[in-house]
Amino acid sequence: MGDITANFSRDEFALPASKALEYGFRGVEYPEEWVESRLRPLCRALEVLRDKLGGRRVRVISGYRPKAYDLARLAAGRRGVSPNSQHHEGRAVDLQVRGVEPAQVYATVLELVEQGLIKVGGVGVYDEFVHVDIRPNEGPVKTWDERSR
């Protein structure tokens, strides 16, 4: 049971202490001031995705990350870290769905957007997960494919 929506809780979107300590941070909670304006709309979109995928569990791989954390990761040589990520603004999630390939999750998110059932600003697919964000966006949804070929 979630405290934001039926299946998602604020804790899932916090930076876990185990990851934070790796780069000299303590566990980082999702900012309270963004819960209603950012996290709740994101979780509502994830609920629609979950329902479309037959109620399968949507696992949050990464939610909110402070910019300083990602900059520390970049300084340590980590690849694939954006200095301007929507994660810094509490508007993004990287996720996996048990039993569903990331390419299918990606296609399903885009289908839901096309049908007008969810509103997102960006969707990207990677080998192991899908990124979904609710960036402010008046134009078309930003999409990308970062899978290895």
Regions found by a protein language model. Give the residues of each.
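Catalytic cores and adjacent binding grooves of peptidoglycan-active enzymes
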Residues: 82-149
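Surface-exposed loop/turn and secondary-structure junction residues enriched for glycine/proline
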Residues: 16-18, 67, 72, 76, ...
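N-terminal start-of-chain detector that recognizes signal peptides
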Residues: 30-33, 62-69, 102-106
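Generic detector of short, locally flexible boundary/turn motifs and exposed helical patches
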Residues: 22-27, 56-61, 96-99
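Extracytoplasmic cell-surface/polysaccharide-interacting catalytic and binding patches
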Residues: 1-52, 136, 141, 146-149
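Short, exposed beta-strand "edge-strand" segments with a Pro/Gly-rich flavor and a Y/T-containing core
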Residues: 1-12, 58-65, 98
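Extended, low-complexity, intrinsically disordered C-terminal regulatory tails
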Residues: 44-77
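Amphipathic alpha-helical interface surfaces
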Residues: 38, 42-45, 69, 91, ...
